[in-house]
Each structure stands twice: as C-alpha cells, then as structure tokens.
Amino acid sequence: MKEYLDVVDENGMPTGETVERSIAHREGFPHRTSHLWLVRKRDGRIQVLLQKRAMTKSFPGCYDISSAGHIPAGQDYYPSAIRELKEELGLTAKESELIPCGDMKIVWDDVFFGIPYHDRQYTKVLLLWADIEEDQLTLQKEEVDGVLWIDLQECMDRVAAGTIQNCISPEVLKLVQAAAAATA
C-alpha cells in the first residue's frame, strides 16, 4: 500500500499537494514527521529509550528516536505520533500525555540500498514519560530490531563523540533534555 504525505511550505504548512513517500524522499519534497521520545527517571537520572532500526530500513542498525513516523496526508502530528507508538512499540498514550519539546527542520541527503535519499522533514519533537521496562514493549519487527534505555546525558555524549551507531540529531536531544528537565 502506498503512503501519501502532505507537501509542506517553508513554514511546515501543507500546500494542498500530496506526494507518495518514496517520491518525497527521492525528489526531496518537504513533508512532516513526528518524533516521540520516551523518558523515565532511574536513580535520580533521566533515561531515554532508543530504538534500534531494522536492517531493512533507512539508517539500518542505527539507534534512533523511541518512536517516529511520517504524518500521512490529511493527518496531524499528535494522532500520528500516538499511532506510531502503538505500531512500533505496542504502547498506548493520550494526546494530553505528550509534551511538546519543539519543532525542527531536518535536511538529510544520503544513499540507501543504492537509492538516493533526500529527506526534508518538518518535525514536531514530543516527549512521553513512560515508567516501563523493555520487556513490556511489543516491537514491530519490520521496523525495530531492539530497544535500549540509556542515561540521557550518556546518550548525548555518545552521539556527540560518535561512539554509538545512531541517526540522532544532537539538537533534538537538547530539546528532549530541556523538556524532560522542565517536567521531571
């Protein structure tokens, strides 16, 4: 089944045009995504849940956002984030539980499996407090190879140093850190 996305303008607002997801990435059409970060507190420190991307996905085998996804045409950020959370990790949440961290524009050019990839995302970064263990999650095997709770500051340090295989933006982690500290 083909997935269609709203093409957005320089402010991240839908233009009325839609495009198939694969074409959006091949041609670099700007579109919307949601990034939902799960956090918890352990021993007085904030931890973040990372998902390890499936080997068949873009950025194969990399640690990434707890749950993320493209916003289907005609839909909005929050319902999409909740849907992706259920699909990828088997968790449910209410929109009122999602804490906005900020908005970002992400530009990324790469090649995956021999195919050019031009990503132009307008992203809403969200946070969800989730006092759960890894074995309480139901992973979507087509998308996620595993998960890892990690101290947020350690994650930030390792991403900055390049000592963890990841596709995480350090700027996004700063947004998550600020929102987590403000709501802890």
Residue map of PLM features:
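Conserved Nudix-box catalytic region and its N-terminal flanking loop in Nudix hydrolases
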Residues: 23-33, 45-83, 87
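Short secondary-structure junction motifs
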Residues: 45, 60, 93-95, 134
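Internal catalytic-core helix/loop-beta-alpha segment
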Residues: 75-113
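Short, well-ordered strand-loop elements centered on a beta-strand within folded domains, enriched
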Residues: 13-18, 44-52, 135-139
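Nudix hydrolase/Nudix homology domain
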Residues: 22, 61, 67, 73, ...
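Acidic, metal-coordinating catalytic segment for phosphate/diphosphate chemistry
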Residues: 1-44
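Short loop segments at secondary-structure junctions
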Residues: 11, 40-43, 54, 129-133, ...
